[in-house]
Design a protein with these regions (language model features):
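Charged helix-capping and loop-helix junction motifs
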Residues: 78-88, 259-260, 316-322, 356-357
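Glycine- and acidic-residue-enriched helix-capping/strand-helix junction motifs
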Residues: 12-23
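N-terminal [4Fe-4S]-dependent radical SAM core
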Residues: 1-3, 9-11, 155-196
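Glycine-rich beta-alpha loop elements in corrinoid/cobalamin-binding modules
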Residues: 29-166, 384
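Structural recognition of alpha->loop->beta junctions
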Residues: 113-132, 293-298, 360-376, 397-403
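C-terminal accessory regions of radical SAM enzymes
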Residues: 2-13, 156, 189, 337, ...
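Catalytic cores of alpha/beta
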Residues: 111-118, 287, 348-362
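Radical SAM [4Fe-4S] cluster-binding motif and immediate context
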Residues: 173, 178-337, 344-346
């Protein structure tokens, strides 16, 4: 089959484009098919016209459309990606005769609602896409019945979408490396954090706001360290990448696999600088020194709160003492930039904890200067999370809310804290 893989347009002014690693992974899992990819986010000033030309020239039998996120999740300047997604879908529908399958993390989290809202979608690929999309392509090529394929949304005779049931999680040891040649790398090199590299899937942590457990499962599934190192060197030597970031939900969990990956990188001569999300608990000097030898120059933490009560309500694995100790390790080594994410008014927030967070931020900026970075955000209520259940219990959302329109959680009794922090952020020009 001729298969087109298309990244959804994010709209005008969406910022630096991110290399579509999902499409690269799909392409690598489609041997025997003629595959071409298109990203309207790097297609110039008239992206839908460029997409239409690509589709007319390639004439696909099947088109896969990736929806990575449905909005920017920023509460003060929230940008919905659904209107540009609709424009992308309309263009694909108009220019192609074959079926359209939509997948990606954004689609998977809101699959039923999106299938209902956009009847132009023929099939939905839920959760991990490599095996399900390849099976869909094979079934369509042979004239079979796609409704027998797991992890698909298929339409019945009335047009209603039916889910075929979740498939078993993919064994990453048998998954080929992403095909990074599916699109030119050059348009993505300006992204500050670089191209994404995956060492594992799954997350055993229990953060109440996070959908990663739903998307990838609670059990870690690891790639071979040597394969990860080979992918990194190929990004540098073949595709011209200048840096990368690890896509793992938390890089150093489990720490033994992360150590093995970094040791393989050192042995393979990986020289690209990189960043990753780290958990504070269990982080030690030896691990960070190995990370530096392997090329890490930026450590990213997401403690989210600075009070033990709020950390417990958020389902975080670390304590304030561990957050402080991890910061001191990074500061004392002196060879990293560090970035932090905090929520302004999470469950369990107190005035004392908010003030302690501000003291921590000012202390870190005083000690590390411009090498310390901070983001203060609201929490978007995502489906399939414990926070969604809490928001329902508190009357913030209805039991049947599809959450396509963003809802931000703020603890009612301390709502003044978020308002105060918003004033500070505006004064700082953020």
């Amino acid at each position: 089959m001729r298969i087109a893989l298309v990244q959804s347009w994010l709209g005008e002014g969406a910022g630096e484009p991110v290399f579509p690693i999902g499409l690269a992974s799909l392409a690598a899992s489609l041997p025997g098919h003629e595959v071409a990819a298109f990203d309207p986010n790097v297609a110039g000033p008239v992206p839908m016209a460029a997409l239409a030309r690509f589709l007319r020239d390639f004439a696909p039998d099947l088109t896969g459309l990736s929806l990575r996120n449905i909005d920017s999740t920023n509460t003060r300047v929230n940008v919905s990606y659904l209107p540009p997604f609709a424009a992308t879908l309309t263009t694909v529908r108009r220019e192609t005769a074959g079926p359209i399958a939509v997948g990606g993390a954004g689609f998977s989290m809101f699959a039923a609602a999106l299938m209902a809202a956009y009847p132009a979608i023929d099939f939905g690929v839920a959760l991990e896409g490599e095996a399900a999309f390849a099976a869909l392509a094979a079934t369509l090529a042979s004239g079979g019945d796609p409704s027998a394929t797991p992890s698909l949304y298929c339409r019945d005779a009335s047009g209603a979408a039916r889910f075929t049931g979740e498939a078993a999680k993919i064994d990453l040891s048998g998954l080929p490396s992403p095909d990074f040649s599916i699109l030119p790398m050059a348009p993505y090199l300006a992204v500050p954090w670089g191209v994404g590299v995956e060492t594992k899937r799954g997350c055993a942590l229990s953060c109440v706001y996070c959908p990663y457990g739903f998307l990838n499962g609670r059990r870690y599934r690891a790639k071979a360290p040597a394969q990860v190192a080979a992918e990194i060197n190929a990004l540098r030597d073949v595709h011209g990448a200048t840096r990368f970031t690890f896509l793992d939900s938390v890089f150093n969990c489990p720490s033994d696999h992360a150590r093995a990956v970094m040791e393989a990188m050192v042995a393979a001569g990986c020289t690209l600088p990189w960043s990753a999300w780290f958990a504070e608990r269990g982080l030690d000097r030896d691990f960070l020194e190995l990370a530096r030898r392997a090329g890490c120059d930026t450590v990213i933490f997401s403690p989210d709160a600075f009070g033990d009560a709020a950390l417990k309500r958020l389902g975080k694995a670390s304590s304030v003492a561990e957050i402080t100790a991890a910061y001191e390790l990074v500061r004392d080594l002196g060879c990293f930039e560090v970035s932090y994410n905090f929520f302004k008014n999470p469950p369990g927030q107190t005035l004392a904890a908010a003030l302690a967070m501000l003291r921590f931020i000012f202390k870190a900026r005083r000690e590390m200067g411009k090498k310390a970075h901070f983001e203060l955000n609201a929490i978007r209520v995502e489906p399939h999370t414990a926070l969604a259940r809490l928001a329902e219990e508190e009357g913030l959302i209805a039991p049947d809310a599809d959450l396509l329109k963003p809802v931000m959680y703020t603890q009612k009794k301390t709502a003044y804290i978020e308002k105060f922090l918003d004033v500070l952020l505006r004064a700082a020009g953020k």
